[in-house]
Amino acid sequence: MRKILILATALAAVLLSGCSPQFNWREFTSKDASWQVTFPGKPAAASRDIDLDGTKTTMTMTAAEVDDIVFAVGETELGDAAGASAGLAAMQAALVRNIGGAVTHSATASSSTNGAMRVSREVEATGTRAGHPMRLVGHFEARGRRLYQVVVIGPATAVKPEQTEQFIGSFKVLK
């Protein structure tokens, strides 16, 4: 019986040593309750004025960083919905430019629900920052006048599909 207990304890120790506490997933709802996502750590928010190819707006970024990987949601509102598609393209281009990158995959979709237009883009890009290979995976979405970017950016070898899919897949527009 003692051997079984020792073996069980040893096995538990081995299994637990493989667990990584680095990702501490938590559900987060934006301050105005317009969106929700699951972050891998405690997020912080900041706002700043940006220029989306000539359209000036204020973007709020909410992000968490884990092991040099940034998980972020950005949101802004345009004066009218007509510029939404161009705004998404400008947001995407700026992020790809930030990593000195090139788009390796992209897909665009659009739909209309109750007269409200929804446009989304899925993007993957690779590049370098400060001489280090970087990877960006993003979901860009327009709902009427509101634009959202849900992105994971980090060292190319550290950005894993499991965490990326969990984060981006958890994003929901609530209103």
Segments the model singles out, each with a brief description of its role:
Residues 1-11:
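Bacterial N-terminal signal peptides that target proteins for export
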Residues 20-22:
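Bacterial signal peptide processing site
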Residues 42-61, 93-143:
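Signature of long, low-cysteine stretches enriched in small and polar/charged residues
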Residues 61-90, 148-151:
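A short acidic-to-branched-hydrophobic micro-motif
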